[in-house]
Amino acid sequence: MSISISDSAAQRVSAFLNNRGKGLGLRLGVRTSGCSGMAYILEFVDEMNDDDIVFEDKGVKVIIDGKSMVYLDGTELDFVKEGLNEGFKFNNPNVSSECGCGESFNV
């Protein structure tokens, strides 16, 4: 089981946590949503849950709940700039299809 984070994503998450002034790391998860079935969740973590799995890469803790791990194993979290847009990108080897709008995926 593994989760990794790119240099650009690590820098962005670290900056967000520093600006926020608190937080243990970043929670990465999935929820049922959209036309393809699942969507990613990204949120700051202030307290750990009993079923959390912690991965640390490039000085950033990425926390995943046990139920989401099966869908996220092997995922790399990246931060990209494309033209005027910038944001987090999920390089997930488990994805079999994505919806046309890019909001959800299926495994």
Swiss-Prot record:
Keyword Iron in the entry? The reply is yes
Q: Which domain of life is it from?
A: Bacteria
Which keywords are on file for this protein? Iron, Metal-binding
| GO BP of this protein | iron-sulfur cluster assembly
What this protein needs as a cofactor is: Fe cation
Where along the chain is Fe cation bound? 35, 99, 101
Cofactor binding description: Binds 2 iron ions per dimer. The dimer may bind additional iron ions.
Name any GO cellular component annotation. Answer: cytosol
Which GO MF terms does the UniProt record name?
A: 2 iron, 2 sulfur cluster binding; iron ion binding
PANTHER family cross-referenced by the UniProt entry: IRON-SULFUR CLUSTER ASSEMBLY 1 HOMOLOG, MITOCHONDRIAL, IRON-SULFUR CLUSTER ASSEMBLY PROTEIN
How does this protein assemble? Homodimer; may form tetramers and higher multimers.
**Family label:** Belongs to the HesB/IscA family.
Summarize the protein's role. Is able to transfer iron-sulfur clusters to apo-ferredoxin. Multiple cycles of [2Fe2S] cluster formation and transfer are observed, suggesting that IscA acts catalytically. Recruits intracellular free iron so as to provide iron for the assembly of transient iron-sulfur cluster in IscU in the presence of IscS, L-cysteine and the thioredoxin reductase system TrxA/TrxB.
Give the protein name, as stated in the record. Iron-binding protein IscA
Organism encoding this protein:
Yersinia enterocolitica serotype O:8 / biotype 1B (strain NCTC 13174 / 8081)
Gene that produces this protein:
iscA
